[in-house]
Amino acid sequence: MEMSSKRKHSSGPISLRSTKHLRSDTAASPQPLTPDDQTLGEEAVYVLDNEDEDLSHVLPLAPAAAAQTDSPEWQATIETVVKSVVSIHFCQTASFDTDLSMSSQATGFVVDAEKGYILTNRHVVCAGPFWGYCIFDNHEECDVRPVYRDPVHDFGILKFDPAAIKYMPVTELKLSPDAAKVGVEIRVVGNDAGEKLSILSGVISRLDRNAPEYGEGYSDFNTNYIQAAAAASGGSSGSPVVNIDGHAIALQAGGRADGAATDYFLPLDRPLRALECIRKGVPVTRGTIQTQWIIKPFDECRRLGLSPEWEAAVRKGSPKETGMLVAEIVLPEGPGDGKLQEGDVLIKVNGELLTQFVKLDAILDSSVGKDVHLLVQRGGEDLEVSCTVGDLHAITPARYVTVAGATFHDLSYQQARLYAIACKGVYVCEAAGSFKLENTFSGWIVDTVDKRPTKNLDEFIEVMKTIPDRARVALSYRHIRDLHTRGTSIVHIDRHWHPHIREAIRNDETGLWDFTNIADPLPAEPPVPRKADFIQLDGANHPAAADIVRSFVRVSCTMPVKLDGYPQARKAGFGLVVDAEAGLVLVSRAIVPFDLCDINVTVADSIIVMAKVIFLHPLQNYTIIQYDPSLVQAPVKTARLSTNYIKQGADTIFVGFNQNFRIVVAKTAVTDITTVAIPPNAAAPRYRALNLDAITVDTGLSSQCSNGVLIGEDGIVQALWLNYLGERTASSHKDVEYHLGLATPSLLPIINQIESGSLPKLRIMDMESYVIQMSQARIMGVSEEWIEKVAIANPARHELFMVRKVDCASPLTEDTHQLEEGDIILTLNDKLITRVSEFDIMYHHETLDALIVRNGQEMRVNIKTVPTEDLETDRALIFCGAVLQKPHHAVRQQISKLHSEVYVSARSRGSPAYQYGLSPTNFITAVNGVKTPDLDSFIKQVNVIPNNTYFRLRAVTFDNVPWVVTMKKNDHYFPMSEYIKDPSAPEGWRSISHDKELLRLDSDNLNADAMDEGRDDGISDMEPDGEK
């Protein structure tokens, strides 16, 4: 258990944690438990696995009893029961309350065949937006929708259309809660471990277990649970627990995650009552005094002060009882606050002795709005109190609001009970967009926005309505795990990528959540010029370092959607001002990877101005951005860039910014200059630097600083120190970040062209090369004459370049490659190539006359260069939660054949793309048998598909394996929209809707933080693992 958790434990032995038996669909892989996870508490562990993964290391497949041959009676019972059991495949399409958006599988069973009701767990029905379907035993499928989810207890009811099941009679299971007794042999029939049907056997061992705690997610309470040994695992949530008569006597809910064959079942008393109310069409009333009770045995009750007289009376009235109900948590400001205390032993309710949760629930549920009278013993003294019963549904959120990319709702009773706090406040259930706070997905309580209190969701909405786009406001908040500490942040309100304040309200008639745009964005206020001064370096021994401070600005970049395989939704670092008069800043492309983003430049730690992308270098890992210099009244200085390449062994001054964004200075020397290529990312291609001379220096600060410069004593910048995004490690699933120097002379032509008023339109050789030494070159067929020429041309490094990989051509264009893997390049336009900088000749030539060595033979080839403006992404389609785009440059660099121009770049949690396994790096080649070679043809085909209808996608994996995806369209939660690059638009891009009826954009609920961009894992927005 985490130290920060406020979970209370009983004085009894510490038990290992329980797990909800959901099974996640294909997307995510199991996460290792920490030692604390494995030894303390009963917190939530969702079983995330692959279809073919061996789960024996998580839970045993079945106890010994399961291996025994069933009797004929049991066989007949099972044959009847399986016809009522369904496999449920579902998504929670948006994060809500205790759960993030997700896709999973579980089990349910029919309890009313005529009206079409299915009983399953509450954590299956979901507190938030639900979308799913069920599969019957004969593999018929039909849609399901929620009609009821209990606010506290772990059960919910789904509805299906019985007429949709045509090839088998729909049968129901009778609910018999009274048949659950110790020693009864049972069978758990369900979707265990993700299988269509599993039958596990066991014997009921306890009826009086307290509800298991699942940690910081949803947990049941104020009910007893039934315990048995059945060893169910992922996917068995909601399975019926049946006796030999074929009656459902309990509902599978959870189990131990430590390998013990122990499962926990919910008694069916309250589900039966809810089902009867729904059948009659009357509300399922639920009452509460906002107090959690737990069962404690008589010996513990005596230590709390239970008198012998009351113990004798209780034992006489209920001879089989072994314990009583004791107050565990009394919520502040609730009906019981000031009247009940933790440790109170409950004796009577409304004058009747009471020791069971079922009777307590019955009284409270029938007394909403009325007073109940409780007799408790506190420290051996009788105490009578009266409490007004509240409506449990009223303190269970049934609406949420999305604004500026984040999702909010009123704090739920679940969360309030978990942390013993008052059930009030604005809860951030998806901390994203403008409200991405301290790298945590959820759990924040917002106290004030723009210095105005937000005590509830309505107050929060009214405050947010008054805040214009791009405003910066103060936010005061606390995390629910640490309410002692109040945080304050300045947030940048985004109402252009996420323009609407959108309210979602649960509709129990339709099972959907209805969306309403309740406020349009206020236009951004015009920026005003501001003054500032730069810091001065105290005690700096190098005047040049003190002066270069005025050439640094901080750059932050936020992206509304994940494109080009880039793994993060926001990134910050430092850039170098290369033209103060024009507001030009050079920054690493690992910070600004593409131009569908918001860029903010902070000057002198004081002035914040917007910036836009001017130029993206296709190979050298830098971006040039521009801000409006008229808004900056500060002595910003243009950095002077050296025209000469720095040499190995040269003395230099390292000036960089550490992880605390503080400037550091050190005198050092250049240790090496090596031609390198950043390693490709195997999981998902993304931009990486190629064919560059990387500079390393002899100082430990270089590993601590991701951005900076190398300067001479005269203050001239000799090299930029940049961060380079590398590969994702297989072990930690984190991204490696390299810190290397880039010499300035190669930057000057680009900067000079931009300063002259024209944008560079570079052309490149569409290939990746690497250095070979003369010993290799000789073996490959390079003549002695050329080896001598290389030694003369480059005395410092005798090397040539061999083609490692030729980029793949588009399937819609003719393959014009003249180079092949293994070619050794001798000259380009008759100039000997022995340095990376000498490849710059390609930037301004449509064709190059190349002399190469191929298969030991010298030959001349005419190489056609590629315009780099065609390599950048200018369009993105959001469809069923998947981000589709033209294959970007990194894909072409790593693959041998492009199968289409419809490439899956990312997908959102809880979406159809996630549910049905359409993975990032897949290519879509056809829709319903019609070829879709590009985005236009794809849009044309999917536009004719009705909502909530299955269609076929023919796809090809990155490893050239074709497969067919069957997917159901969902326009309600995931309408199709598109981002198109448009220089005339204020942000440089515009969004259009393909939702013909509602004209809604998927950007209304788009969340880059909830997207994953990799093939093999569901982890998103990971911070870099380290540097090399």
Swiss-Prot record:
Q: Which Pfam families match?
A: PDZ_1, PDZ_6, Trypsin_2
Q: Per the UniProt entry, what species is this protein from, by scientific name?
A: Ajellomyces capsulatus (strain NAm1 / WU24) (Darling's disease fungus)
What Gene3D superfamilies would the database entry show? Answer: 2.30.42.10, 2.40.10.120
Protein name per the record? Pro-apoptotic serine protease NMA111
Q: Where is the composition biased (Basic residues)?
A: 1-10
> Which keywords describe this protein according to UniProt?
Apoptosis, Hydrolase, Nucleus, Protease, Repeat, Serine protease
Q: Which family does it belong to?
A: Belongs to the peptidase S1C family.
Q: Which gene encodes it?
A: NMA111
What are its E.C. numbers?
A: 3.4.21.-
Which branch of life, at top level?
Eukaryota
What SUPFAM superfamilies is this protein classified in?
Answer: PDZ domain-like (SSF50156), Trypsin-like serine proteases (SSF50494)
* Active-site positions on this chain: H123 (charge relay system), D154 (charge relay system), S236 (charge relay system)
Name the residue ranges with Acidic residues bias: 1019-1028
Which InterPro entries does the annotation name?
Answer: PDZ (IPR001478), PDZ-like_dom (IPR025926), PDZ_6 (IPR041489), PDZ_sf (IPR036034), Peptidase_S1_PA (IPR009003), Peptidase_S1C (IPR001940)
Give the location in the cell. Answer: Nucleus
Q: Cite the GO molecular-function annotations of the record.
A: serine-type endopeptidase activity
Q: Name one GO biological process term.
A: apoptotic process
Every PDZ domain range: 292-377, 878-959
GO CC: one term?
nucleus
Q: What does this protein do?
A: Nuclear serine protease which mediates apoptosis.
Q: Where is this region: Serine protease?
A: 85-269
The region called Disordered is annotated at 1-39, 1003-1028
Coarsely, its chief localization is: nucleus
